[in-house]
Structure formats: C-alpha cells, structure tokens
C-alpha cells in the first residue's frame, strides 16, 4: 500500500491530502504539522481579531480527530519535519512536545510547509506577528488581559491593513507606520490614495518613511526621533518560505528560498511535490516566473497534485494570473496580472476609466477607477487594477477571465454586461476600456 507523507496541514497540505483520499481510498496518508492547529482559515485571522468573525471556531475547519474520522488521514500536530533524505525516501520528524525524533518513509512526499512572518528582531513582550491561529489567540488574549488601547501596526501590506481596520473596528486606537512611501505594493502607487484618505477620515495616525529604532517596555523610539508609548505592536513586514529544513536535501531552492516547480508541481527530485507559499511557478499570460502566495494557488496546486498521484498524468498547471483583492474600510483594492514593478519588461500602453460603479441616477453610486495595461505588440492584457467602494471585484474577475483566454483589449468592447441600474451601465467600464484603447 503506497504511503503518502504531507508536510503542512493548512490550505495546501490538508486540501491535497483530502483530494487524494477522495480519489484513492487505499493509500496510507499522514500529515505532519509543526504548529498546534490544522486546516484553519488564514484569511479569517484579522477578522477574528476584529470580532467580525464572532466565534474563532468558525475559522477552524477540522481537528486531527475529526479529519481522521471523516477521511481516514492521520494528522500529527506539533510534529516538525526537520530534514529530508530523498535518496532513502525518508523524512526526519521532531515531536515538539517530547523532543523525540524519528524517521518516516514515504513513496510520495508533498511539501506544503507554508511561510513564516518576518520579524524586526526586537526583544519585547508587547510585539506580535500574525500568521496562524495561535498568533491570533495570543493577540486576542493580550488585548483582553492588558486592557490594550494604543496599538502600533508596522507595515502597509494586505495583512497590516486588514489588522489595522479590525483593531479600529474593535474600538482600539491603532497607528500605522511604514518604512517607505510605497504602500500596498500589489497596487499601482497612485491608486492607493484612498487608503490614506480612509485613515484621515477616521483620524487614524500614520507615518510613512518611518521605522522603529528601539523598544523599551512601552516606550518606542523611532527613526524620525519621535518617542511614543504603545500598549502593543503588531508587525506585518512580510513573510519568508519555511524551507530551511529542505537545504540538506537535493531539492533545488531559488535564491529567496522558494522551490521552483514544473507544471505538475514536481520538484527536481522524483516523487517530491511542492505546493502553496513555498513553491514558485510562472504566469499564465506572459513568459515570466511568478510566486503568488495566496489561497487560490494553494488550492489549485493541491487538486493538480492529487489528480496526478491518483493516476491522471495529463493534468497540468497553466500558470498564475495573480488575482488579488483587499478591503480597507469603505474601499476595495483589486488587481490581476504582472506586478507594477514588472511592467517595465514590456512595451505597453495604459488605458483607464473612472465613472460610477452603476447607473448615475440610481441611489448610492460612487466612483470606480479601472485601469488596464496591454502589450502593444499583440494588444493582450498584461495587468489590470480597480479601486472603488463597489464593483471592483466584479470587474477584476471579468478581466481575469479575459486574460485567461488571451483576449485583446479591443475585444473588451464585446463583453456583454449583466445590466440593471443598481449594478452597472449599458456600456460598462470594461466596455469603455476597450473603446478608449482603440
């Protein structure tokens, strides 16, 4: 009976194991997870902190016991894979509760260890990061136990913005700092102005080009020379792949610690796959490498690997489009395609439209800003971005589908909109992009 070992039990690992079991009732499947919880919703964590998700149990899909009862898959939490011997096809496992080490053999190995939050490295009892449910519980308990009021949020990416919003909605008083003036880097810089407007509207302090120099108890000294007091600090300064344990194997890593994979999510070593935040692949619509550590990619990779292990040799990954979205108070920011800093590799033109998200005479209308970049050689879409209080998600998903099917910007005139006054226009923003491009 084949043995399948999975490293990591969150989005990629648990999903892949579950999909394998759906297709293969016989194989022995075991998952090693180094942390306390399995199969939790990473994307829910800021909303658990903000008490938007009122019961944290809603963010936890399975326990190991429930997973085994439903799927006959063994999950061992607090078990960390610390080394891989790909020649013997074994992994070395550390039981983090007992410090016992043992070896486990495999026929197929699926690596989905995820990523860890970067830290600024200050020794402080008031500093936290947010990556898993344990972090979420620690933050929530600290807030309650210490009557936290003033919170410093460091960083201005998706996680930091979501955390800041949820702290504010919880009734706390957050302040945002970021080490540069470039915030929310997946969006075009000039389309991020509503983030600052939303902060100003709520009188939430923020400082760009600012960093922490020292932490002494609750006293924070900044690069600017300011000295302020905070009850708590939450760092959102990026992540790094959990690939240290892979270095002793023959598995190839790139310079950033990611595992390059082929279109079957195979590594360079036979019988070993990599999925989720640790894997890097390529874009679907252009010939560039792409690392997209988001939920859709982990779930798609999990399904592809499961199909292959179950015997479908023809299924392949066609590449990322990098579709992403974030809510920040009243606004939605969404984009798809190459990153802003990758556009310089193309000869491109940009076309944009700003108009109401739905018919102007229908109540509640607000501006929606839609922007599309296209390749001048073939007029296919390279990137699109949308910002507004409504309708950004709808338009970016339509453009994602257009890119998936290699439509040109001109063909957007033929997009048949689902029109009624509360939703759109007879000639929608997407149509207008096509007309303006001509």
UniProtKB/Swiss-Prot annotation:
It catalyses: NADP(+) + 2 CoA = CoA-disulfide + NADPH + H(+). Homodimer. The keyword Nucleotide-binding does not apply. It is an enzyme of class 1 (oxidoreductase). Signal peptide: none annotated. Contains 2 FAD binding domains and a single NADPH binding domain. The active site is at 43 (nucleophile), 43 (redox-active). NADP(+) binds at residues 151-166. Belongs to the class-III pyridine nucleotide-disulfide oxidoreductase family. FAD binds at residues 8-33, 267-277, 419. Its cofactor is FAD. One of its GO terms (molecular function) is NADP binding. Reduction of disulfides occurs by a thiol-disulfide exchange reaction, but involves only a single catalytic cysteine residue that forms a stable mixed disulfide with CoA during catalysis. Coiled coil: none annotated. Keywords: FAD, Flavoprotein, NADP, Oxidoreductase, Redox-active center. Its EC number is 1.8.1.14. This is Coenzyme A disulfide reductase. It comes from Staphylococcus aureus (strain USA300). Catalyzes specifically the NADPH-dependent reduction of coenzyme A disulfide. It holds the Pfam family Pyr_redox_dim. Substrate binds at residues 15, 19, 22, 39, 42, 71, 299, 427. The lineage of its organism: Bacteria, Bacillati, Bacillota, Bacilli, Bacillales. Binds 1 FAD per subunit. The keyword GTP-binding does not apply.
């Amino acid at each position: 009976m084949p043995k399948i070992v999975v490293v990591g039990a969150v989005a990629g690992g648990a999903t892949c194991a579950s999909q394998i079991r759906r297709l293969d009732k016989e194989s022995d499947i075991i998952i090693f997870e180094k942390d306390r919880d399995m199969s939790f919703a990473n994307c829910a964590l800021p909303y658990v902190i903000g008490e938007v998700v009122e019961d944290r149990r809603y963010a936890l899909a399975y326990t190991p016991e429930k997973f085994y009862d439903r799927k006959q898959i063994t999950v061992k939490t607090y078990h960390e894979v610390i080394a891989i011997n790909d020649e013997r096809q074994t992994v070395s496992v550390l039981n983090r509760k007992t410090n016992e080490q043992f070896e486990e053999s495999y026929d197929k190995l699926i690596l989905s260890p995820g990523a860890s939050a970067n830290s600024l490295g200050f020794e402080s009892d008031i500093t936290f990061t947010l990556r898993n449910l344990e972090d979420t519980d620690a933050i929530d308990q600290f807030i309650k136990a210490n009557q936290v009021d003033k919170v410093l949020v460091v960083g201005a990416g998706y996680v930091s913005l979501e955390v800041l919003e949820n702290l504010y909605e919880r009734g706390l008083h957050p302040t945002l700092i970021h080490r540069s003036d470039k915030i929310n880097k997946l969006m075009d810089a000039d389309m991020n102005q509503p983030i600052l407007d939303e902060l100003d509207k709520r009188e939430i302090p923020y400082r760009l080009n600012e960093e922490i120099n020292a932490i002494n108890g609750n006293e924070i000294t900044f690069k600017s020379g300011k000295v302020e007091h905070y009850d708590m600090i939450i760092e959102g300064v990026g992540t790094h792949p959990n690939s240290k344990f892979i270095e002793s194997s023959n598995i190839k890593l790139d310079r950033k610690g990611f595992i390059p994979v082929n279109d079957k999510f195979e590594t360079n070593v036979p019988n070993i796959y990599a999925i989720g935040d640790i894997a890097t692949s390529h874009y679907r619509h252009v010939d560039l490498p792409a690392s997209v550590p988001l939920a859709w990619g982990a779930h798609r990779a999990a399904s592809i690997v499961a199909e292959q292990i179950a015997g479908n040799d023809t299924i392949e990954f066609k590449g990322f489009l990098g579709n992403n979205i974030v809510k920040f108070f009243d606004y939605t920011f969404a984009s798809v395609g190459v990153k802003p800093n990758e556009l310089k590799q193309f000869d491109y033109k940009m076309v944009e439209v700003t108009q109401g998200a739905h018919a102007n005479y229908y109540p509640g209308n607000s501006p929606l800003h839609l922007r599309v970049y296209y390749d001048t050689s073939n007029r296919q879409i390279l990137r699109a971005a949308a910002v507004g209080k409504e309708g950004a998600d709808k338009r970016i998903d339509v453009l994602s589908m257009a890119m998936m099917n290699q439509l040109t910007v001109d063909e957007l005139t033929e997009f048949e909109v689902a029109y009624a006054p509360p939703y759109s226009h007879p000639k929608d923003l997407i149509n207008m992009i096509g007309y303006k491009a001509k």
